[in-house]
Regions:
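Structural recognition of the conserved hydrophobic beta-strand(s) that form the central parallel beta-sheet
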Residues: 66-68, 90-96, 117
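Sensor-1/coupling segment of RecA-like P-loop NTPase cores
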Residues: 85-106
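Interdomain motor-coupling "hinge/lid" segment immediately C-terminal to the ATP-binding subdomain
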Residues: 104-223
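Accessory nucleic acid-recognition modules appended to NTPase machines
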Residues: 175-347, 351-354
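Catalytic cores of nucleic-acid endonucleases
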Residues: 364-405
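Conserved P-loop NTPase "ATPase switch" module shared by AAA+ and STAND
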Residues: 55-76
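Conserved catalytic segments around the Walker B and adjacent sensor/switch elements
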Residues: 6-27
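Active-site beta-strand-loop-beta-strand hairpin of nuclease catalytic cores
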Residues: 7, 11, 351-361
Length: 406
Protein backbone atom coordinates (compact mmCIF):
# COMPACT_ATOMS: atom_id res chain seq x y z
CA UNK A 1 0.00 0.00 0.00
CA UNK A 2 2.81 2.41 0.87
CA UNK A 3 4.54 1.51 -2.40
CA UNK A 4 1.34 2.29 -4.32
CA UNK A 5 0.99 5.64 -2.57
CA UNK A 6 4.57 6.74 -3.09
CA UNK A 7 4.60 5.71 -6.76
CA UNK A 8 1.28 7.30 -7.76
CA UNK A 9 1.09 10.53 -5.74
CA UNK A 10 3.36 13.48 -5.12
CA UNK A 11 2.66 13.36 -1.40
CA UNK A 12 1.68 10.48 0.86
CA UNK A 13 0.69 10.43 4.52
CA UNK A 14 0.70 6.91 5.98
CA UNK A 15 -0.87 6.25 9.38
CA UNK A 16 -1.04 2.75 10.89
CA UNK A 17 -3.44 2.60 13.82
CA UNK A 18 -1.58 -0.27 15.52
CA UNK A 19 1.77 1.50 15.36
CA UNK A 20 3.18 4.67 16.88
CA UNK A 21 1.91 6.71 13.94
CA UNK A 22 -1.63 5.72 14.92
CA UNK A 23 -1.10 6.83 18.51
CA UNK A 24 0.37 10.13 17.31
CA UNK A 25 -2.53 10.82 14.96
CA UNK A 26 -5.09 9.96 17.65
CA UNK A 27 -3.43 12.54 19.89
CA UNK A 28 -3.60 15.10 17.08
CA UNK A 29 -7.28 14.33 16.52
CA UNK A 30 -8.08 14.70 20.21
CA UNK A 31 -6.30 18.05 20.32
CA UNK A 32 -8.02 19.34 17.18
CA UNK A 33 -11.51 18.32 18.32
CA UNK A 34 -11.15 19.49 21.92
CA UNK A 35 -13.77 22.13 22.73
CA UNK A 36 -14.92 24.01 25.79
CA UNK A 37 -18.18 25.94 26.26
CA UNK A 38 -17.85 29.52 25.06
CA UNK A 39 -15.16 28.73 22.50
CA UNK A 40 -15.71 28.83 18.74
CA UNK A 41 -15.87 25.43 17.13
CA UNK A 42 -13.31 24.40 14.52
CA UNK A 43 -15.35 23.47 11.45
CA UNK A 44 -12.22 22.00 9.87
CA UNK A 45 -11.09 19.98 12.89
CA UNK A 46 -10.13 16.90 10.86
CA UNK A 47 -7.96 18.92 8.50
CA UNK A 48 -6.45 20.61 11.53
CA UNK A 49 -5.60 17.18 12.94
CA UNK A 50 -3.90 16.13 9.69
CA UNK A 51 -1.89 19.36 9.64
CA UNK A 52 -0.86 18.81 13.25
CA UNK A 53 0.33 15.34 12.26
CA UNK A 54 2.08 16.49 9.08
CA UNK A 55 2.82 20.21 8.70
CA UNK A 56 3.46 19.71 4.96
CA UNK A 57 -0.08 18.44 4.28
CA UNK A 58 -1.67 19.85 1.13
CA UNK A 59 -5.32 19.07 0.49
CA UNK A 60 -5.33 18.39 -3.23
CA UNK A 61 -5.57 15.46 -5.65
CA UNK A 62 -1.81 14.99 -5.64
CA UNK A 63 -1.99 13.86 -2.01
CA UNK A 64 -3.05 10.48 -0.65
CA UNK A 65 -3.77 9.72 3.01
CA UNK A 66 -3.53 6.02 3.92
CA UNK A 67 -5.15 4.93 7.19
CA UNK A 68 -4.14 1.33 7.87
CA UNK A 69 -5.68 -1.07 10.43
CA UNK A 70 -8.61 1.30 10.84
CA UNK A 71 -10.50 -1.18 13.04
CA UNK A 72 -8.24 -0.18 15.94
CA UNK A 73 -9.94 3.19 16.43
CA UNK A 74 -13.66 3.91 16.27
CA UNK A 75 -12.85 7.63 16.65
CA UNK A 76 -10.83 7.62 13.42
CA UNK A 77 -13.13 5.16 11.63
CA UNK A 78 -16.09 7.43 12.32
CA UNK A 79 -14.33 10.25 10.45
CA UNK A 80 -14.51 8.42 7.11
CA UNK A 81 -17.59 10.40 6.07
CA UNK A 82 -15.80 13.68 6.78
CA UNK A 83 -12.76 12.55 4.79
CA UNK A 84 -15.01 11.62 1.86
CA UNK A 85 -17.05 14.83 1.84
CA UNK A 86 -14.59 17.56 2.83
CA UNK A 87 -11.18 16.50 1.52
CA UNK A 88 -9.81 16.94 -2.00
CA UNK A 89 -6.98 14.54 -1.20
CA UNK A 90 -7.51 10.84 -1.82
CA UNK A 91 -8.08 8.76 1.31
CA UNK A 92 -7.49 5.00 1.44
CA UNK A 93 -8.76 3.17 4.52
CA UNK A 94 -7.73 -0.44 5.12
CA UNK A 95 -8.36 -2.99 7.83
CA UNK A 96 -7.48 -6.61 8.51
CA UNK A 97 -10.28 -7.58 10.90
CA UNK A 98 -13.23 -5.43 9.94
CA UNK A 99 -15.60 -7.64 11.90
CA UNK A 100 -14.77 -5.38 14.82
CA UNK A 101 -16.41 -2.45 13.02
CA UNK A 102 -19.80 -4.14 13.53
CA UNK A 103 -19.65 -3.08 17.17
CA UNK A 104 -22.02 -0.25 18.22
CA UNK A 105 -19.34 2.45 18.54
CA UNK A 106 -18.41 2.15 14.85
CA UNK A 107 -20.56 4.21 12.46
CA UNK A 108 -20.86 2.77 8.95
CA UNK A 109 -20.57 5.63 6.42
CA UNK A 110 -22.94 4.17 3.82
CA UNK A 111 -22.77 5.89 0.45
CA UNK A 112 -19.53 7.72 1.19
CA UNK A 113 -17.00 5.01 0.37
CA UNK A 114 -15.97 2.72 -2.46
CA UNK A 115 -15.33 -0.68 -0.92
CA UNK A 116 -12.65 -3.07 -2.17
CA UNK A 117 -12.29 -6.51 -0.59
CA UNK A 118 -8.73 -7.80 -0.73
CA UNK A 119 -8.79 -11.57 -1.15
CA UNK A 120 -6.15 -14.18 -1.86
CA UNK A 121 -4.94 -14.77 -5.41
CA UNK A 122 -7.32 -16.50 -7.80
CA UNK A 123 -6.06 -19.39 -9.91
CA UNK A 124 -5.83 -17.02 -12.89
CA UNK A 125 -3.70 -14.59 -10.86
CA UNK A 126 -1.62 -17.50 -9.57
CA UNK A 127 -0.92 -18.58 -13.15
CA UNK A 128 -0.03 -15.02 -14.09
CA UNK A 129 2.72 -15.03 -11.45
CA UNK A 130 4.36 -17.90 -13.35
CA UNK A 131 3.69 -16.51 -16.83
CA UNK A 132 1.03 -19.09 -17.72
CA UNK A 133 -2.14 -17.00 -17.78
CA UNK A 134 -2.23 -16.57 -21.57
CA UNK A 135 -1.98 -20.34 -22.04
CA UNK A 136 -4.87 -20.80 -19.61
CA UNK A 137 -6.96 -18.15 -21.35
CA UNK A 138 -6.51 -19.55 -24.85
CA UNK A 139 -6.52 -23.31 -24.28
CA UNK A 140 -9.39 -25.32 -25.79
CA UNK A 141 -11.86 -26.64 -23.21
CA UNK A 142 -12.43 -29.93 -25.00
CA UNK A 143 -8.95 -31.32 -25.51
CA UNK A 144 -8.07 -30.01 -28.97
CA UNK A 145 -4.74 -28.45 -27.94
CA UNK A 146 -1.38 -30.03 -27.20
CA UNK A 147 -1.21 -32.70 -24.50
CA UNK A 148 1.78 -31.03 -22.83
CA UNK A 149 -0.15 -27.76 -22.42
CA UNK A 150 -2.96 -29.45 -20.51
CA UNK A 151 -0.41 -31.31 -18.43
CA UNK A 152 1.41 -28.08 -17.55
CA UNK A 153 -1.77 -26.32 -16.44
CA UNK A 154 -2.84 -29.37 -14.44
CA UNK A 155 0.49 -29.34 -12.60
CA UNK A 156 -0.08 -25.72 -11.60
CA UNK A 157 -3.64 -26.50 -10.52
CA UNK A 158 -2.39 -29.33 -8.31
CA UNK A 159 0.03 -26.93 -6.64
CA UNK A 160 -2.61 -24.21 -6.26
CA UNK A 161 -5.11 -26.54 -4.61
CA UNK A 162 -2.48 -27.34 -1.98
CA UNK A 163 -1.00 -23.90 -1.26
CA UNK A 164 -3.75 -21.46 -2.24
CA UNK A 165 -3.26 -17.80 -2.98
CA UNK A 166 -1.94 -15.96 0.07
CA UNK A 167 0.82 -13.73 -1.39
CA UNK A 168 3.46 -14.78 1.16
CA UNK A 169 2.80 -18.44 0.35
CA UNK A 170 2.89 -17.90 -3.42
CA UNK A 171 6.14 -15.94 -3.12
CA UNK A 172 7.62 -18.80 -1.09
CA UNK A 173 6.70 -21.31 -3.79
CA UNK A 174 7.95 -19.05 -6.59
CA UNK A 175 11.32 -18.73 -4.88
CA UNK A 176 11.89 -22.27 -3.61
CA UNK A 177 9.34 -24.61 -5.25
CA UNK A 178 9.10 -26.36 -1.86
CA UNK A 179 5.59 -27.37 -0.78
CA UNK A 180 6.65 -28.08 2.80
CA UNK A 181 7.95 -24.52 3.14
CA UNK A 182 4.58 -23.32 1.86
CA UNK A 183 2.75 -25.42 4.46
CA UNK A 184 4.94 -23.86 7.16
CA UNK A 185 4.00 -20.41 5.88
CA UNK A 186 0.30 -21.31 5.96
CA UNK A 187 0.67 -22.50 9.56
CA UNK A 188 2.28 -19.16 10.44
CA UNK A 189 -0.61 -17.27 8.83
CA UNK A 190 -3.12 -19.30 10.85
CA UNK A 191 -1.19 -18.61 14.06
CA UNK A 192 -1.07 -14.89 13.26
CA UNK A 193 -4.82 -14.82 12.65
CA UNK A 194 -5.60 -16.60 15.92
CA UNK A 195 -3.19 -14.50 17.97
CA UNK A 196 -4.35 -11.19 16.51
CA UNK A 197 -7.98 -12.19 17.01
CA UNK A 198 -7.33 -12.37 20.76
CA UNK A 199 -7.35 -8.57 20.87
CA UNK A 200 -10.97 -8.50 19.76
CA UNK A 201 -12.43 -11.10 22.11
CA UNK A 202 -13.19 -10.57 25.78
CA UNK A 203 -13.40 -14.31 26.45
CA UNK A 204 -10.21 -16.24 25.66
CA UNK A 205 -12.39 -19.34 25.27
CA UNK A 206 -13.75 -17.82 22.06
CA UNK A 207 -10.26 -17.67 20.59
CA UNK A 208 -9.55 -21.27 21.54
CA UNK A 209 -12.57 -22.26 19.44
CA UNK A 210 -10.91 -21.34 16.15
CA UNK A 211 -8.63 -24.35 15.80
CA UNK A 212 -11.48 -26.70 16.71
CA UNK A 213 -13.82 -24.89 14.33
CA UNK A 214 -11.41 -25.17 11.39
CA UNK A 215 -11.17 -28.91 11.97
CA UNK A 216 -14.93 -29.24 12.46
CA UNK A 217 -15.67 -27.40 9.20
CA UNK A 218 -13.26 -29.69 7.35
CA UNK A 219 -14.90 -32.79 8.82
CA UNK A 220 -18.41 -31.51 8.13
CA UNK A 221 -17.66 -31.03 4.42
CA UNK A 222 -16.84 -34.73 4.24
CA UNK A 223 -19.66 -36.06 6.40
CA UNK A 224 -22.66 -34.09 5.18
CA UNK A 225 -23.44 -33.78 1.49
CA UNK A 226 -27.04 -32.55 1.62
CA UNK A 227 -26.65 -29.69 4.06
CA UNK A 228 -27.77 -29.60 7.66
CA UNK A 229 -30.66 -28.05 9.51
CA UNK A 230 -28.52 -26.19 12.02
CA UNK A 231 -24.86 -25.70 11.15
CA UNK A 232 -24.03 -24.31 14.58
CA UNK A 233 -25.38 -27.41 16.31
CA UNK A 234 -23.57 -29.77 13.93
CA UNK A 235 -20.28 -27.92 14.30
CA UNK A 236 -20.69 -27.96 18.06
CA UNK A 237 -21.14 -31.75 18.02
CA UNK A 238 -17.91 -32.19 16.07
CA UNK A 239 -15.84 -29.58 17.90
CA UNK A 240 -16.84 -30.97 21.30
CA UNK A 241 -17.77 -34.63 21.30
CA UNK A 242 -19.41 -34.38 24.69
CA UNK A 243 -21.42 -31.72 26.48
CA UNK A 244 -18.73 -30.32 28.74
CA UNK A 245 -20.46 -27.02 29.40
CA UNK A 246 -17.38 -25.20 28.11
CA UNK A 247 -19.04 -23.71 25.04
CA UNK A 248 -22.32 -21.88 24.47
CA UNK A 249 -24.17 -21.47 21.19
CA UNK A 250 -23.60 -17.72 21.49
CA UNK A 251 -19.82 -18.24 21.70
CA UNK A 252 -19.86 -20.52 18.67
CA UNK A 253 -21.99 -18.12 16.62
CA UNK A 254 -19.64 -15.30 17.61
CA UNK A 255 -16.60 -17.25 16.43
CA UNK A 256 -18.28 -18.29 13.15
CA UNK A 257 -19.35 -14.71 12.44
CA UNK A 258 -15.80 -13.56 13.07
CA UNK A 259 -14.44 -16.12 10.59
CA UNK A 260 -16.95 -14.95 7.99
CA UNK A 261 -16.29 -11.24 8.53
CA UNK A 262 -12.55 -11.92 8.36
CA UNK A 263 -13.05 -13.70 5.00
CA UNK A 264 -11.71 -17.01 6.23
CA UNK A 265 -14.88 -19.01 5.50
CA UNK A 266 -17.95 -18.52 3.34
CA UNK A 267 -21.27 -20.32 3.09
CA UNK A 268 -23.43 -21.95 0.47
CA UNK A 269 -27.22 -22.15 0.46
CA UNK A 270 -29.39 -25.14 -0.40
CA UNK A 271 -31.95 -25.17 -3.22
CA UNK A 272 -34.50 -27.92 -2.64
CA UNK A 273 -35.30 -29.79 -5.88
CA UNK A 274 -33.38 -27.13 -7.86
CA UNK A 275 -36.14 -24.64 -7.08
CA UNK A 276 -34.86 -21.07 -6.75
CA UNK A 277 -37.93 -20.27 -4.63
CA UNK A 278 -36.97 -22.90 -2.02
CA UNK A 279 -33.64 -21.69 -0.69
CA UNK A 280 -32.25 -22.46 2.76
CA UNK A 281 -29.35 -20.18 3.68
CA UNK A 282 -26.19 -21.13 5.60
CA UNK A 283 -26.40 -24.83 4.82
CA UNK A 284 -22.74 -25.54 4.12
CA UNK A 285 -19.39 -23.86 4.75
CA UNK A 286 -16.31 -23.58 2.55
CA UNK A 287 -12.85 -22.13 3.13
CA UNK A 288 -12.07 -18.96 1.18
CA UNK A 289 -8.50 -19.99 0.40
CA UNK A 290 -7.43 -23.29 -1.12
CA UNK A 291 -4.26 -23.48 0.97
CA UNK A 292 -6.20 -23.12 4.22
CA UNK A 293 -8.71 -25.70 2.97
CA UNK A 294 -5.96 -28.19 2.12
CA UNK A 295 -4.18 -27.59 5.43
CA UNK A 296 -7.18 -28.59 7.55
CA UNK A 297 -8.70 -31.19 5.22
CA UNK A 298 -5.40 -33.07 5.05
CA UNK A 299 -5.26 -33.16 8.85
CA UNK A 300 -8.58 -34.94 9.24
CA UNK A 301 -6.97 -38.27 8.37
CA UNK A 302 -9.03 -38.73 5.20
CA UNK A 303 -7.37 -40.33 2.17
CA UNK A 304 -5.98 -38.10 -0.55
CA UNK A 305 -8.73 -39.16 -2.97
CA UNK A 306 -11.37 -37.82 -0.57
CA UNK A 307 -9.42 -34.66 0.20
CA UNK A 308 -8.82 -34.03 -3.50
CA UNK A 309 -12.54 -34.30 -4.22
CA UNK A 310 -13.47 -31.79 -1.50
CA UNK A 311 -10.74 -29.42 -2.71
CA UNK A 312 -12.15 -29.62 -6.23
CA UNK A 313 -15.56 -28.59 -4.87
CA UNK A 314 -14.00 -25.77 -2.86
CA UNK A 315 -12.25 -24.53 -6.01
CA UNK A 316 -15.53 -24.39 -7.93
CA UNK A 317 -17.25 -22.72 -4.95
CA UNK A 318 -14.67 -19.91 -5.00
CA UNK A 319 -15.13 -19.44 -8.74
CA UNK A 320 -18.92 -19.24 -8.39
CA UNK A 321 -18.66 -16.90 -5.42
CA UNK A 322 -16.50 -14.46 -7.37
CA UNK A 323 -18.84 -14.65 -10.37
CA UNK A 324 -21.82 -13.98 -8.12
CA UNK A 325 -20.19 -11.03 -6.32
CA UNK A 326 -18.52 -9.43 -9.35
CA UNK A 327 -21.22 -9.78 -12.01
CA UNK A 328 -24.99 -9.66 -12.42
CA UNK A 329 -25.13 -13.07 -14.10
CA UNK A 330 -26.13 -15.40 -11.26
CA UNK A 331 -29.12 -15.40 -8.92
CA UNK A 332 -28.71 -15.53 -5.15
CA UNK A 333 -26.56 -13.91 -2.49
CA UNK A 334 -24.30 -16.95 -2.08
CA UNK A 335 -23.53 -20.00 -4.26
CA UNK A 336 -26.18 -22.73 -4.16
CA UNK A 337 -26.05 -26.49 -4.05
CA UNK A 338 -29.19 -28.58 -4.51
CA UNK A 339 -30.98 -31.64 -3.23
CA UNK A 340 -33.38 -33.89 -5.11
CA UNK A 341 -35.94 -35.26 -2.68
CA UNK A 342 -37.31 -37.79 -5.19
CA UNK A 343 -34.17 -39.92 -5.03
CA UNK A 344 -32.68 -38.50 -1.83
CA UNK A 345 -29.77 -37.15 -3.85
CA UNK A 346 -27.51 -34.10 -3.92
CA UNK A 347 -26.12 -31.88 -6.67
CA UNK A 348 -22.80 -30.24 -5.87
CA UNK A 349 -23.74 -26.81 -7.30
CA UNK A 350 -26.87 -25.31 -8.82
CA UNK A 351 -26.88 -22.03 -10.76
CA UNK A 352 -29.92 -20.03 -11.79
CA UNK A 353 -28.81 -17.73 -14.60
CA UNK A 354 -30.04 -14.14 -14.67
CA UNK A 355 -28.97 -13.93 -18.32
CA UNK A 356 -31.29 -16.56 -19.82
CA UNK A 357 -33.21 -17.69 -16.68
CA UNK A 358 -32.16 -21.29 -17.24
CA UNK A 359 -31.12 -23.79 -14.57
CA UNK A 360 -27.54 -25.05 -14.69
CA UNK A 361 -26.19 -27.95 -12.68
CA UNK A 362 -22.51 -28.42 -11.88
CA UNK A 363 -21.20 -31.81 -10.81
CA UNK A 364 -17.63 -31.95 -9.55
CA UNK A 365 -15.67 -35.19 -9.75
CA UNK A 366 -11.94 -35.36 -9.00
CA UNK A 367 -12.00 -38.67 -10.87
CA UNK A 368 -14.48 -40.32 -13.22
CA UNK A 369 -17.88 -40.68 -11.58
CA UNK A 370 -21.46 -41.46 -12.55
CA UNK A 371 -23.15 -38.21 -11.33
CA UNK A 372 -26.42 -40.10 -10.73
CA UNK A 373 -28.37 -37.25 -9.12
CA UNK A 374 -27.22 -34.67 -11.64
CA UNK A 375 -28.28 -36.82 -14.58
CA UNK A 376 -31.65 -37.55 -12.95
CA UNK A 377 -32.29 -33.82 -12.45
CA UNK A 378 -31.46 -33.19 -16.09
CA UNK A 379 -33.66 -36.04 -17.29
CA UNK A 380 -36.61 -34.88 -15.17
CA UNK A 381 -36.40 -31.30 -16.41
CA UNK A 382 -35.20 -29.77 -13.15
CA UNK A 383 -32.04 -28.69 -14.98
CA UNK A 384 -31.72 -27.19 -18.44
CA UNK A 385 -27.98 -27.80 -18.70
CA UNK A 386 -25.44 -29.88 -16.82
CA UNK A 387 -21.70 -29.34 -16.52
CA UNK A 388 -19.67 -32.30 -15.31
CA UNK A 389 -16.21 -31.31 -14.10
CA UNK A 390 -14.04 -34.33 -13.56
CA UNK A 391 -10.47 -35.51 -13.39
CA UNK A 392 -8.15 -35.58 -16.37
CA UNK A 393 -10.73 -36.22 -19.09
CA UNK A 394 -10.61 -34.68 -22.55
CA UNK A 395 -14.17 -33.44 -22.26
CA UNK A 396 -17.05 -33.34 -24.69
CA UNK A 397 -20.66 -32.27 -25.27
CA UNK A 398 -23.67 -34.59 -25.40
CA UNK A 399 -27.04 -32.88 -25.86
CA UNK A 400 -27.39 -30.68 -22.76
CA UNK A 401 -24.43 -32.25 -20.94
CA UNK A 402 -21.04 -30.59 -21.11
CA UNK A 403 -17.81 -32.11 -19.79
CA UNK A 404 -14.84 -29.70 -20.09
CA UNK A 405 -11.36 -31.18 -20.17
CA UNK A 406 -9.68 -31.53 -16.79
Amino acid sequence: MKKFGSENFERMIYINMVEQSGKDFTECLEKATKWEPGQERDDQALKTAIKLYDKNFVDDENTVIILDEIQESSAVYNQIRTFAREFHAYVIVTGSYLGKTLQPDFFLPAGDIDQLIMETLTFEEFLDVFGEYELYRKIDLYGADREEDYKRLMEYYEVYQKIGGYPAVVVSYAQEKNLNKCYEQIRKLIDIFVNESKRYFTDIMDVNLFEKLFNAIALLTMQEKKGVGDLTTELSKIAYQEDSGRMTKKMLNHAISWLQESHVIGYASKAIDCDYKKIKDNSRYYFLDMGIAHYFLSRTGASWDIVKGILAENFVYLSLRRRLLDTEEIAGIAPWFATYEKINGELVFFVRSRMDYKNYGIEVKSADGIAKTAKALLKDGKLDYLYILKGTTKGGIKQHRCTPSG
